[in-house]
Structures are given as structure tokens and as C-alpha cells.
Amino acid sequence: MAHTASTFAERARPPQARAYAVAAATLCLLSLSPARAHDASDASIPATPGLQINAAAAVGYQHADQPVPAPRLTGVLGLGDTPTDQRGWALEHGTLGASVRLTPLLGAAVSFGKHGSERAHTEAAWLEARPSADSDFTLGAGRNRMPLGPVIGNAGHLDRFGQMPLIKRAAFNGDWIEDGVNLSWRPHLEGAFEWLQGIDAGLWRARRFPGSENAAWAPTVRARAAGALWGNAGDWEADTFYSRLEPQGRGAYVQRSNSGHIHTAPQCSASLRDITCFDGTVDLLGASASWATPLPGVRLTAAGVLRNERGNLYSQNGDTRYKGRTSGGWLEALWQPTAQWDVAVRQEWLRSTHSLDGPGATLVATDANLLPYHPSRRFSAMLGWRPHPSVLLAVEAGRERIAGQGNSLVALRLVYTSGPLLERSW
């Protein structure tokens, strides 16, 4: 039964699953920071002419009453895919990469990754040039992780916690890797503007969610700042980014159990059977901050992402005008009493509001997984030990409520993030 001039609105809160990834090149452990993945703004190309080969992997055992990750995030406009249940032993993520600086002005990096039983894929294929060896400007092109900042970009990559943050799953369907070009500026300012660490500006193909195969190139900007607080109150770092996408015919499966985890939206050019489609504009805004407090070994981190969408949302059951907002983030506290031990907790949340106006609005909302709505949230705690700087052994426990179902999780994880396996200079 069709509805005319129907309206629908709803709200939601947090969840998700896991997908661990390794950087598009050199992945390293910082003694008081998480394992670090590189994006287009910070490619792991040697500073001087030479070659590096890198590898990293994370394996784990997860025990839970319900599937991990949760089959779906209700009330979130996504791709409708259902991730593979990863309870038991699994390869969370593994990568193998190489980077080379051919001359002081030209370098390149390539990285291949694999998640569990999924096929291997190219995570990075990046060419980078600079006008001089000591230039503040770098121009890169190819495939790479989007420049979101290390807090948001690295979450879910050899992270201390074993699940992809809820907002990353909702906003990007996990990792956001695109083809494009990026101009980086890394100034060395003094005085009143010494806090400004860098600016990135790029154009990206936007073929992966939340973009689509037929989307226009997406402009993306990111700024990074850092400094010391007054009165010896510790050091801080902060990042913010913005991107505008214009997907056309971005399909999503009417939620089903056999769609598998995907990053590229199904096409809307043929039949609308078991598909919902979106044409419109997507605005993505994110920010993150990290504070190394005066307390020894204590670091506090916060991150948030907002996704606004407006346009046409339709299926075989109706055609509507759509406006939606998805927002979420997390707060994290880390205590490292020594360089060998990590104790951390993370609280996540996710919220959504949606408005559909037009024939069949309620049916379209149901097809698009916007109904029924249940709030979601997650709390996680971990204890980690580093017998070697490149190895993290961690025990994790958490509780989440997603799609109206509670789930308790206990995990044992091994994360290996070495420095270069092979390094040559010339």
C-alpha cells in the first residue's frame, strides 16, 4: 500500500564490528601512542632515496553470544550488507607493502591487504612528488586512505580495540580508501601560528561508500594542529576534515543475510528488486583530539563524525524526498604505567535522524533499514602487554546494544606491527 505525502523521522545511537587494517606502508608503534596507519597526507615513503618493505598482521579469538560484528546498524542509511560473523579464531587483517624514494623529489608506495576469508585487495598505490627535498609542499596521486587524521583514520587498524568504531562503520562502511589527488602543506611556523601542523586539499573519485560509481569528484580538506597547553598541562593534537560527495544511483541492499561485506554500492541502473537507491548530496565533517595529560602515561582521546545527506531515496515501493543526519563518535582513556603495558577504556555512541516525504515513505524507510529503529551503544575495556615493541598481546571485554539486542564480547588478540622488514638506501 502506497503512502502519499507521508513523513517519517527517527533517532538512533551507536554500534559495530571489526575490520582491522594495516597502513599503506610503514606501520610503527609509538611508545606512548597507538599503532599508526598512514593516509594520503602522511605516506610512509622514505625521507631519503631508498627502499622499505613492510608487513603487519592482527589475529584474534572472539567469543560472543551474538554475531560479531553485528549484522546491521538499524536506523542508518548504508549499503545493506551483512558482515561475515568473525567469532572464533580469525585473521583480522594483514598487509604487505613496499615504498621507495627514487630521487629526493619523487617517491611511491604500494600496499596489499587481506581481511579474514575475503580476497586480497590493493589498499594503496601512491605516487608522490615535491618541488625540493626540503619543501613544505607535497603532491600525491593514486589510491590511498582518505586524510581523516590519525585518530579517526587509524581506529580499527591494528588498534588497541578489536572492533571498528560504530561511526566509522556507519559513515564510511569501515575503511575509506579512494583514488584521487592530494596536496599537502606541512609548514614549520613560529610564533602565533606554530600550532598549525598541516593542511591537506584534494579531489577524490568517490566511488566507494558514501559515494557511488557515478559520483562527481569529491573535494576534501583536512587541517591538523598541535601544541602544548599552558602551565605544563600536557601536549595536545587535533584534526578536522570536511568532504562533499554527490552520489548518483547509490544502491543499497534491502537487508539480507547473504550480501556479504562490501565497500562499493550496488548499481541502480537495472532493476530495483531488493535495492534502495539514493541520488543527492553528502556532507561529511569530522574532528578528533588527543591530550597527553600531566598524569604519567595517561592520554585522553575524543573523536566525532557527522554525515548529512539530502536528495531522493527510492525503491520499488516508493519515491521520496530524503533528509538524514548520522552522527557519532567515541571517548577513550588510556593509561600506560610502563612502555610494556596498556590499560584502556572506550565509550562509543551513534545517533541518526531521518525525514522522508513522498509516496510510500514508510515502505521505503523499511527497505532502507531506517525502520524499525533501536538505539545502539558500546563500551569496551582492554589490557595489553608488549613483550616486544612490535607485538601487542591484548585481552578485551565489552558490552554493546545494537538493533535492540545486547551482546557481550570477550576477545584475545595478537597484533604485530613491525618497523621495516627490509630497508635499503642509495
Task: Kindly label every feature range from the protein language model.
Residues E92, H121-E123, R205, W217-P219, ...:
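Transmembrane beta-barrel architecture of outer-membrane proteins
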Residues A35-D85, P150, Q248-G251, W341, ...:
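Outer-membrane beta-barrel biogenesis signature
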Residues A21-S31:
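Bacterial N-terminal signal peptides
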Residues Y61-P67, G116-A120, P147-V151, L189-G191, ...:
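Gram-negative outer-membrane beta-barrel proteins
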Residues I45-D65, P83-A206, E213-N232, W335-P337, ...:
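Outer membrane beta-barrel
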Residues P46-T48, Q52, P69-L73, A228-N369:
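Detector for outer-membrane/organellar transmembrane beta-barrel domains
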Residues L183, W385, G406-W426:
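Outer-membrane beta-barrel "beta-signal"
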